[in-house]
């Protein structure tokens, strides 16, 4: 039963764009499920481009197309721009701004502070090179790290963080039937194992190490395949494609480019591998989706990914080590079907307990009410909303 509020809590979500499926999809999942009896959500992004922008529009909430950050150098000009942002935020008049801008910008936080608006940010990556992150953190009313190592490395001793990992829609990734169209398109009939990775092809994702690891085990199998799903319009991707041709693996390694429906790709995979470099990740959603889809998964032993494999340590491999990746592929191939099925079932249960979208929404809503209460002193008991 929902307790009726005299005023809904107005939340403005800021996000650079809806180009990136991970970030955009995460925000759409949150807004589509947040309790509209209690919260009044809005979006601000920089432009209308991006595969998911139309999906965001279908949420039927106000979307502001505007800049919400400003360069802070030179300082005087930066402060002038911040005051302009202050006017923009005051016109929208949210109670809370939740920033999904994952850069180290602090102009947005400063403008919110000057406007008297509570400001929250989600920390998605393991970057912390500049002093700007410290200023951003100082100005925030609450911080949402996405893995335990962020807490220990960046926020130890702070009381204003809430560890809230990304959640996924379990129903979307359960009982997926094998996509025969993809099987035929990529000539996967009688291929084993079919290895899948989903990541934009940029250096931090370590795809070159995955390719080298695949090359080490290629001759151990009659017809294995590696499918690389993700944005491949980059110089790094072009370099990898040349490398694959030089290795004479272009009939075994498939670059699909960016795909809007990654769900179908899980249906054709035997193994999922995320080979990110030692820099680490925030909380890669592709690993969660793979596990929820019933695909046995392996990942680099790095921050972010380590959290997601905390109950499966033998499914982690040394980052930037092709030999270690090759060993995990062989580890999978030597498993009995009984062992594979057991591990897959445990993975699914782990995701259900720890990474469901319902868990994420519940914890976000509790945080919003806590931050709002600190502003308005309403003493609203969020548990009464259920």
Predicted regions and their residues:
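A conserved mid-protein helix/loop that constitutes part of the nucleotide-sugar donor-binding site
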Residues: 21-29, 193-219, 226, 238-239, ...
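Glycosyltransferase donor-sugar binding loop
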Residues: 43-50, 168, 198, 225-239
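Short hydrophobic beta-strand element within catalytic cores of glycosyltransferases
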Residues: 45, 296-299
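Short His-centered aromatic/hydrophobic patch
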Residues: 99-105, 123
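A conserved, positively charged/aromatic
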Residues: 113-148, 155-156
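A short helix/loop element that forms part of the nucleotide-sugar donor recognition site in Leloir-type
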Residues: 174-188, 241, 337-338, 344
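Active-site donor-binding acidic/aromatic loop of nucleotide-activated sugar
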Residues: 235-238, 250-259, 265, 316
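Conserved acidic donor-binding segment of nucleotide-sugar-dependent glycosyltransferases
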Residues: 311-323, 331-337
């Amino acid at each position: 039963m929902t307790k009726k509020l005299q005023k809904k809590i107005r939340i403005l979500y800021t996000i650079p764009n809806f180009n990136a499926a991970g970030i955009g999809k995460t925000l759409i999942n949150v807004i589509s499920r947040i309790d509209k009896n209690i919260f009044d959500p809005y979006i601000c992004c920089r432009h209308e481009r991006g595969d998911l922008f139309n999906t965001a529009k279908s949420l039927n909430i106000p979307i502001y197309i505007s800049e919400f950050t400003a360069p802070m150098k030179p300082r005087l000009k930066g402060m002038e721009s911040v005051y302009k942002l202050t006017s923009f935020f005051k016109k929208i008049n949210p109670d809370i701004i939740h920033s999904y801008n994952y850069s180290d910008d602090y102009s947005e936080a400063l403008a919110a502070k000057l406007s008297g608006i509570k400001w929250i940010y989600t920390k998605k990556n393991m970057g912390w090179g500049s002093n700007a992150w410290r200023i951003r953190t100082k100005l925030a009313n609450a911080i949402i790290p996405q893995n335990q190592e962020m807490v220990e490395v960046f926020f130890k001793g702070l009381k204003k963080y809430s560890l809230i990992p990304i959640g996924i829609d379990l129903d979307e990734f359960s009982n997926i039937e094998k996509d025969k169209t993809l099987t035929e398109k990529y000539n996967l009939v009688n291929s084993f194992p079919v290895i899948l990775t989903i990541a934009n092809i940029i250096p931090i994702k370590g795809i070159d190490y995955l390719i080298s690891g695949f090359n080490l085990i290629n001759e151990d199998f009659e017809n294995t395949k590696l499918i690389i799903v993700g944005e491949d319009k980059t110089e790094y991707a072009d370099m990898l494609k040349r490398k694959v041709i030089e290795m004479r693996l272009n009939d075994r390694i498939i670059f699909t480019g960016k795909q809007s429906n990654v769900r179908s790709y899980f249906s054709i995979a035997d193994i999922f591998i995320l080979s990110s470099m030692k820099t680490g990740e925030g909380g890669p959603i592709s690993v969660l989706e793979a596990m929820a889809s019933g695909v046995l998964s392996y990942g680099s032993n790095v921050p972010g990914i380590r959290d997601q494999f905390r109950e499966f340590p033998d499914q982690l491999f040394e980052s930037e080590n092709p030999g270690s990746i090759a060993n995990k592929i062989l580890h999978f191939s030597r498993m009995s079907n009984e062992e594979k099925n057991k591990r897959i079932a445990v993975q699914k249960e782990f995701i259900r307990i720890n990474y469901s979208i319902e868990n994420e929404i519940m914890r976000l809503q509790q945080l919003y009410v806590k931050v709002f209460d600190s502003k308005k002193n309403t003493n609203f008991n969020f548990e009464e909303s259920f």
